[in-house]
């Protein structure tokens, strides 16, 4: 008789994906972030569901309903802070996951990589709309500024913005539709993540050496199920420590003031995980140019498979590319810092230099480094 997990139609799918899946024997802790992102998504959907039970998407009562959740709902404060900081954890894991993909050449699995980029866009859209829902000062003005960027699109821009707003300013219609989209998008993300996994399992995982691992595979369970579980425990412990001791560290104090269309905050800025893109947007004086740069700052990831010139897949044995990779990481940290600073000297020029360096490393320096390394390493 066949084992149930190998014969039952549903369990067979789970078996092929998480139990009998052949996996490379040498994948490191950097391969844990896929499962951690799955954990983040589950945490966000669960906490978000409970928040949605008590939240009201109306401009008059939205801010009060969030205060009510924190004060009157049993453990509402905990659910709210888990959800708010869960978004930060989600993006930390996302950026580390993408960084791993760039460093070890995982982008050579083109379908998996491109669906990953779609997932990134979906997650960014979800996070942006979620930030609007508490209807604080930064929620309102962040929504106004970011949606207004679409007005830079020639000919249809103004009509498009009013269509998204559902009126002539960010108001009740905007809040209601943002709540609806914020609720549905995580389920679309979950479905897209399944497709992401489907394509990954067509090729199998990459590994730190960037070489085929068909000669040395091990079953996913128990080796990587336990390894992933350890990662989940460590990250959860750090996350809960953060939520319980420093819940407001990453938030903006302005969001504790109710939205007021008549009073603009001195510095409008998004959440920390969007600051690098916001800095690139602000570094170009032209509105349309800034919007194009903003979109390209993420879309440029799709060019990685096309710009791969090295004969080795991974950066593990390519010192010039390694140097450029860590310069890129440092550059992104500088952009994140600049995005949170006011638009005044010397921050303007630092942001412009960092933006140019960001695109230069990806589009020019890394491909050139690959060619140089081919020569040096006699490939």
UniProtKB/Swiss-Prot annotation:
Its main location: mitochondrion. It is found in: Mitochondrion inner membrane. GO terms for biological process: mitochondrial electron transport, ubiquinol to cytochrome c. It is a multi-pass membrane protein. Heme b b566 binds at residues 97, 196. One of its GO terms (cellular component) is mitochondrial inner membrane. InterPro entries: Cyt_b/b6_C (IPR005798), Cyt_b/b6_C_sf (IPR036150), Cyt_b/b6_N (IPR005797), Cytb/b6-like_sf (IPR027387), Cytochrome_b (IPR030689), Cytochrome_b_C_euk/bac (IPR048260), Cytochrome_b_N_euk/bac (IPR048259), Di-haem_cyt_TM (IPR016174). Belongs to the cytochrome b family. Component of the ubiquinol-cytochrome c reductase complex (complex III or cytochrome b-c1 complex) that is part of the mitochondrial respiratory chain. The b-c1 complex mediates electron transfer from ubiquinol to cytochrome c. Contributes to the generation of a proton gradient across the mitochondrial membrane that is then used for ATP synthesis. Heme 1 (or BL or b562) is low-potential and absorbs at about 562 nm, and heme 2 (or BH or b566) is high-potential and absorbs at about 566 nm. This is Cytochrome b. It comes from Chaetodipus fallax. The lineage of its organism: Eukaryota, Metazoa, Chordata, Craniata, Vertebrata.
């Amino acid at each position: 008789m066949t084992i149930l997990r190998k014969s039952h139609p549903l369990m067979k799918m789970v078996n092929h994906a998480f139990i009998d899946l052949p996996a490379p024997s040498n994948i490191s802790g950097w391969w844990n972030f896929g499962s951690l992102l799955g954990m983040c998504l589950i945490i966000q959907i669960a906490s978000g569901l409970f928040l949605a039970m008590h939240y009201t998407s109306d401009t008059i009562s939205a801010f009060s309903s969030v205060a009510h959740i924190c004060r009157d709902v049993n453990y509402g404060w905990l659910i709210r802070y888990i959800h708010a900081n869960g978004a930060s954890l989600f993006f930390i894991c996302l950026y580390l996951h993408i960084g791993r993909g760039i460093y070890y050449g995982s982008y050579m699995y083109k379908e998996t990589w491109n669906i990953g980029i779609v997932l990134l866009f979906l997650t960014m859209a979800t996070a942006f709309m979620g930030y609007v829902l508490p209807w604080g000062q930064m929620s309102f003005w962040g929504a106004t500024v970011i949606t207004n960027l679409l007005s830079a699109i020639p000919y249809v821009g103004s009509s498009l913005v009013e269509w998204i707003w559902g009126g002539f300013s960010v108001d009740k219609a905007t809040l209601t539709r943002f709540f609806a989209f914020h609720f549905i998008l995580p389920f679309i993300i979950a479905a897209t993540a399944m497709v992401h996994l489907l394509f990954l399992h067509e090729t199998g995982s990459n590994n730190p050496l960037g070489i085929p691992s068909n000669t040395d595979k091990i079953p996913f369970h128990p080796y990587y199920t336990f390894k992933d579980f350890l990662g989940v425990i460590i990250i959860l412990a750090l996350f809960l420590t953060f939520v319980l001791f420093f819940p407001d560290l990453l938030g903006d104090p302005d969001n504790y003031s109710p939205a007021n269309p008549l009073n603009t905050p001195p510095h409008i800025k998004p959440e920390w995980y969007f600051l690098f893109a916001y800095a690139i947007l602000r570094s170009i004086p032209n509105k349309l140019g800034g919007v194009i740069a903003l979109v390209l700052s993420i879309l440029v990831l799709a060019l990685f498979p096309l710009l791969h010139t090295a004969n080795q897949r991974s950066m593990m044995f390519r010192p010039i590319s390694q140097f450029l990779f860590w310069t890129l990481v440092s550059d992104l940290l500088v952009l994140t810092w600049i995005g949170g600073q006011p638009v005044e000297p010397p921050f303007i020029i630092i942001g412009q230099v960092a933006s140019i360096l960001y695109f230069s490393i990806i589009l020019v320096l890394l491909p050139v480094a690959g060619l140089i390394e081919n020569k040096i390493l006699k490939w």
